[in-house]
């Protein structure tokens, strides 16, 4: 039996980047073609997916030595963990009983125009009634559920990238 060689650090970083691009393209397809408008938590999840992707792209371009790999791995993992937390909150909101769903709030542009930055960020991460709607599901998981699964995968690969020797 022949043992195949694992992808290099740079190749794996590019695979992570490509995966993040694919996730964002899927989100844009759902928004623009299917007409599924993103709620504030959806947009927040996109931001953290973009964060993981950009960190991985920079890591691929830089192709650092051991310490740099740990730094990039930690940064990508941090972005992934925060994104997974936002996804988990989103799934939690979607599974609340109807009488406990928070009221619908303002849209994202209004939040950042009308409120100080920290207050707008608190509102953004809290989510609102718009975030509780399940607009589509596949194999029993809503879009935020699948995003959570994607974040778990990105976190696992990012941790491995930070810990790998070669």
Swiss-Prot record:
Instruction: Write out the topological domains of type Cytoplasmic.
Output: 1-12, 65-70, 165-166
Gene3D superfamilies recorded: DsbB-like
Gene Ontology cellular component annotations, sorted alphabetically: plasma membrane
**GO MF annotation terms:** electron transfer activity; protein-disulfide reductase activity
Superkingdom as given in the UniProt entry? Bacteria
Q: Does the keyword Membrane apply?
A: yes
The UniProt keywords, alphabetically, are: Cell inner membrane, Cell membrane, Chaperone, Disulfide bond, Electron transport, Membrane, Oxidoreductase, Redox-active center, Transmembrane, Transmembrane helix, Transport
Q: How does it sit in the membrane?
A: Multi-pass membrane protein
**Function recorded in the entry:** Required for disulfide bond formation in some periplasmic proteins. Acts by oxidizing the DsbA protein.
Q: What name has this protein been given in UniProt?
A: Disulfide bond formation protein B
Q: Corresponding gene? A: dsbB
